[in-house]
A protein has these predicted regions:
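Phosphate-group recognition and catalysis centered on beta-loop-alpha active-site segments
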Residues: 1-211
Length: 211
């Protein structure tokens, strides 16, 4: 969520979403070159900082000096928030969907546990063997949703692991995709799982929910 002069992936944007009734906030995480966690969608530096840089190559001190830009690429007063600051601000308020964090899951979970917020976290990732092993190792009790692209090739495997498998994000190009068929939806429903369709349209060339 963002609005007016408020950039996305900021505490100000999260507050807007909560005021509008949001139950879950999605955020992107990265680690600075010296190991501190921040909330920002890496790769979006030109749009959100008006700088052609790779923010993860900067120190935490340097990142704290940066200011986010609004939709017109005008600099705001808002900083790139640390993950610790975001956790403390949102404690007890809503569910936090941590995106782009599987490769830094160990420090991410250390921060979550430090703030005592395990029950507020939702982890998502691709269902690769490597990602699932990381979830099992560092976040076995955390609500987890794999991201299935067109078809589900991993549920049987996940069910045999020590993972709190509560549902899945499904991405499908056409209404004929296996993950959107009634038989599959009913099977997951009977197992008490939530299926989450991604209706965001980043590009008309890459439909995430059949259009």
């Amino acid at each position: 969520t963002s609005g007016g002069n408020i950039p996305p992936n900021s505490i100000a944007a999260f507050d807007i979403a909560l005021k509008e009734g949001a139950d879950i906030l999605e955020m992107d995480l990265f680690q600075s070159i010296d190991g501190e966690l921040f909330v920002f969608h890496t790769g979006m530096e030109p749009s959100h900082l008006d700088r052609h840089i790779r923010i993860e190559r900067y120190t935490a001190g340097e990142i704290r000096q940066m200011r986010l830009c609004n939709g017109d690429l005008q600099q705001t007063f808002l900083p790139v928030n640390s993950f610790d600051d975001v956790l403390e601000h949102l404690k007890g308020k809503c569910k936090l969907n941590l995106d782009r964090s599987i490769n830094i899951i160990e420090p991410v979970m250390k921060a979550v546990k430090k703030h005592g917020m395990e029950d507020q976290i939702l982890m998502k990732s691709d269902p690769s063997d490597q990602s699932l092993k990381l979830i099992e190792a560092y976040a076995p009790t955390i609500d987890y949703m794999p991201i299935f692209m067109e078809e589900d090739l991993a549920s049987d495997k996940i069910e045999k692991m020590n993972i709190n498998y509560i549902g899945a994000e499904i991405v499908f190009e056409k209404e004929t995709s296996p993950v959107i068929q009634e038989s599959y939806l009913e099977m997951q429903k009977k197992k008490g799982r939530i299926l989450w369709g991604n209706a965001i349209l980043y590009s008309s060339r890459v439909p995430l929910a059949a259009g």
